[in-house]
A protein has these predicted regions:
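Glycine-rich beta-alpha loop elements in corrinoid/cobalamin-binding modules
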Residues: 2, 30, 34-171
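Hydrophobic/aromatic residues located in beta-strands of well-ordered beta-sheets
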Residues: 3, 95-96, 250, 283
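Residue-level recognition of beta-strand->loop/alpha-helix junctions
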Residues: 7, 42-44, 219
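Residue-level signal for short, function-critical loop segments
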Residues: 9-12, 72, 102, 206, ...
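Conserved strand-to-helix beginnings and helix N-cap segments that scaffold or border functional pockets
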Residues: 17, 50, 78-79, 144, ...
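Radical SAM [4Fe-4S] cluster-binding motif and immediate context
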Residues: 175-303
Length: 303
């Protein structure tokens, strides 16, 4: 079976080609690992995105199942894409799936509204019900395992934003799943640098356990529950990016590197990797200030 995954445009950004969306590339990698054929349409920075989609659906090798990711400001474009596919390919589109941060957060909020019998608000519930009209399946939370059932299910919602869900990734699953399928997109079109060195983003940890009031994800287990990859899996990905793309800059896009108890050992292994290849990397990442220690600082400085 072939599935087409789509990254909608983000014209609200000053530059749409800074960091590629790794989440949907992780899903693509999971599909490829199970011998699915995957097409990726990256519409970041593409103004004539409908024309691009039209060209794709007129190919003989087009997919019949489509998966779209969307942040909140991308949702209007995701809806337009979904409607276009269904209108242009009536009977040929078996399913259009929506995942990503927006539907996850709205579903989380809708569950909280329902628990209060919708006293005070039902805005999130209305949003989710509206999305159900446009998409065949909504995937909330981790998509790497949920995608397989999303392709075949008759349910409208797959709730992977639940620690008891079979789709909610454990530390071990997060470590052994394949790295993002970056080969499916034009990585050279993404421009980010650290001290003048071209860099790519890497995710070593999921989740943030803190309760900052400004954060819309604080009620979502998917965004709150810490899941860390093994040091070995992170180093393997970094080494692969260096060998494949010649990448010497790495942006660790974790919420806080130093909630990972293995952070110091990971920094030490990054040192060893640079010594192995005789190269100097440029690294960047976020830390939680009140958790920051001298030992962590020394390890980061060495790396």
């Amino acid at each position: 079976m072939k599935i087409c995954l789509i990254i909608p445009p983000s014209p609200f950004l000053l530059d749409e080609r800074v960091f590629v969306q790794l989440g949907i590339l992780k899903i693509a990698a999971s599909l490829e690992q199970q011998n699915y054929s995957v097409d990726m349409i990256d519409l970041s920075g593409v103004e004539n995105y409908i024309d691009v989609l039209n060209d794709y659906i007129n190919t003989s090798t087009r997919a019949s199942v489509f998966g779209i990711t969307a942040t909140t400001p991308q949702v209007p474009y995701a809806v337009k894409i979904g409607q276009f596919l269904k209108n242009k390919m009536p009977g040929d589109v078996s399913k259009v799936i929506l995942g990503g941060p927006h539907v996850t957060l709205m579903h989380t909020a809708a569950k909280r509204e329902a628990a209060k019998n919708f006293v005070g608000s039902n805005r999130a519930h209305k949003d989710v019900e509206c999305l159900k009209q446009y998409f065949d399946v909504l995937v909330c939370g981790d998509g790497e395992l949920a995608i397989f059932d999303a392709i075949t299910t008759n349910e409208k919602v797959i709730d992977a934003d639940n620690t008891k869900s079979e789709y909610f990734l454990s530390h071990e699953q997060f470590s052994v799943l394949p790295p993002p399928a970056r080969h499916l997109v034009d990585m050279s079109s993404y421009k980010y640098s650290i001290e003048g060195v071209p860099a790519l983003s890497v995710i070593a940890q999921l989740g943030c356990p803190f309760h900052c009031t400004f954060c819309s994800g604080r009620n979502s287990p998917f965004l709150r529950k810490i899941r860390t990859r093994s040091t070995e899996s992170v180093i393997e990905e970094v080494e692969s990016l260096y060998l494949t793309y010649g990448t010497k800059g790495f942006m660790f896009y974790d919420d806080e590197l130093n909630v990972n108890k293995n952070m110091v050992s990971m920094m030490n292994e990054l040192c060893n990797l640079q010594e192995k290849h005789g190269v100097d990397f440029r690294l960047r990442g976020f830390v939680k200030a009140e958790l920051f220690t001298d030992k962590q600082a020394e390890a980061m400085y060495r790396a």
